């Protein structure tokens, strides 16, 4: 009996774990199909949906059924048409609601960016809103697919053709040309598409530069002194270190005024180019044009480990240099903007969630770019189209059923295609640095030795002394601050 109890308990645990690993999957109404192959029978690569799945999208299913229609679900359940208020109950039917065994992911593809050449803000916007293939046609077709009437001009029978593009303040308005004759109900009331609230965000990873003009390092000063060993034993286990801070000056120019409207999302470090290392940071949420130059202070050091024979000295030479670098640069700025559709909806079918039939005038704004809110986010609404509670704006399932999944995916991908503007200019920097500390040939100490003692540094109890002429004011004028020399025991 004990063995049987353990086996039964194991089965219960296994069943529980199996149930826990299979979470409910969303049912996208646009992928449902009604098959008339008999009770619980679906076409190839389809399966009957069960009661719980049908319950999650009941309103969508009922909207696709006849008034008194009864269709089957899995496991001897049926769903009734709108005449029965969409009741789900046990029963049998000759038709069956089915769902793909491998549902399409149906994600909106991400297309390569639409790149706009450099220019000021008006130039960049003009190029975008006047581009028929990459902008006018895609946004016009989206308005048409959603049910807006008359998205086109009098001189063409096609959506998105013969469109006027008008600048209104900081906005641009697209509307079908009404300068000709038209036939159809309220055909003189063209739907409009307003483009507004342009913003530009720098993409740090898009940095590129042209030919680099880099000067050869120029010697600006030489410091010569001595390392003296006054002891009776050779000295070789000590490091002589030069520490200093140097100020590098940099500047950038921006070719066009668009840079004033470009902002940085995160703290941005200017990429290092060439041998002149200038570490530049631009704070987050700043205008790209707000910081066009400055000075960067950097702490640097150079070390050498001299070998100084007993009662000898070696010459020490430190060379100080400066170098310049300049080059043209380019970044990309990601553009974002609002699209506002305005016009009356077609009575013969529209994708507004209530599907009104009285041709109401409707204005709706989509945000193209970063997420703002659910009402303006195409991707959010598309991804949540299986949730009845989130279908407060557009019925994307209806749009898919009317126009096809591939058509809607392509349309939305073109509307959401990233748009990037070029930011160009010139960069220049000048920096100072010390070369290697050079050690010369040892010279025995003698009575005729004369050592300039502008600055003397002793190694603690080492018998090693540095006599280096360091003029703080002179070095500061050359861009070298806080210059110190030290003698410390070698670490390795």
Curated annotation (Swiss-Prot):
Residues annotated as region Part of the transmembrane beta-barrel after proteolytic activation of the toxin and insertion into the host membrane?
256-288
Q: What is its main location?
A: secreted
Q: Where is this site: Important for heptamerization?
A: 374, 390
Q: What does this protein do?
A: Secreted, cytolytic toxin that forms pores in host membranes after proteolytic removal of a C-terminal propeptide, leading to destruction of the membrane permeability barrier and cell death. The pores are formed by transmembrane beta-strands and are approximately 3 nm in diameter.
Give the domain note.
The C-terminal propeptide is required for normal protein folding and secretion; it maintains the aerolysin precursor in its soluble form and prevents premature heptamerization and pore formation.
Return the annotated region ranges for Interaction with host N-linked glycan: 68-84
Q: What is this protein called?
A: Aerolysin
What family does this belong to? Belongs to the aerolysin family.
